[in-house]
């Protein structure tokens, strides 16, 4: 069976969890079947990977139009595939067109949902309407839909009631615990100005409304003064949020704030995660949150928002602490001050008890190893492909 994975992100251009997912899923699927990858951007040297640039004439168009232009070329390349599997709205339209054009079965993995990310209008303008349209059409017509968490499945069926529950199955994201493992060296820390002899709180993520960095920076005013704050944060969605975050960082009245804005190589991130006392995930929308698994695999305690699929990853009181959030329709907290205070309280609880933080970190790695292996995820995905190819229901009866 030839499977074409359709994605915006693929190494070396990986910015978020969806890109990480496709990278590792492709690696494991290649052991099981003929797997091709079709991605955005510059050509890749890897065999079996085709990349597509924005078509000529669309260079100055709205970003959403550029995406749809790439998708049309990507769909043309899918001729001959036995099944196409698209990831995120950026590639959903390509899979949808390939299904219509060639009759190829189409599987969609939902890593997020456009109706639950209204702040994307700040980035895409009117293109947000296009992204929502592309996602809805692909999901409605797909032969099978994979949700990366039970929370995502619930959100999807609520957002798109036209989707039959029998077509939606849950297959979690995973983690390579051989690669993501504790690194006790400190050279990376010292090079970036992090004092390895002092405790620190770390955030790793893009500067977006979704990732909640603004809320973390408000909470940081209440962190224990002895703790460093390390922000591995870049790729802002808009100039406006970049300016807001910059002002908040400058306004922190504390020493030991380290802001690394460039994208770091994975081994450097692993070392930074390893030595942190606490990893913080303040997201207001997170269908799964691979980054929490990455921290857990590095034996680091996690403080994360109790939203989306995060509670399926972070075991509250065992591998970390969850922060309750009372959310508005757009995901933002009704009471931002209370959310920031609760975030600070849980971070400080672990800073004050490093032995507890260490125990949670150890439990987190065990959980990551036992429940989130990419090998098992690829096997379950392959089982779904076979069912779809045979024309069977994606979710077995009973």
PLM-predicted stretches and their roles:
Residues 86-91, 110:
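Short His-centered aromatic/hydrophobic patch
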Residues 20, 199, 203-222, 243:
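A conserved mid-protein helix/loop that constitutes part of the nucleotide-sugar donor-binding site
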Residues 151, 174:
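Carbohydrate-associated surface elements
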Residues 301-304, 314:
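Short hydrophobic beta-strand element within catalytic cores of glycosyltransferases
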Residues 104-105, 115-137, 154:
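Nucleotide-sugar donor phosphate/pyrophosphate-binding loop at the beta->alpha transition
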Residues 42-43, 175, 228-246:
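Glycosyltransferase donor-sugar binding loop
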Residues 284:
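Aromatic "clamp/platform" in nucleotide-sugar-dependent glycosyltransferases that forms part
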Residues 242-267:
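Nucleotide-activated donor-binding/catalytic signature segment of Leloir-type glycosyltransferases, i.e.
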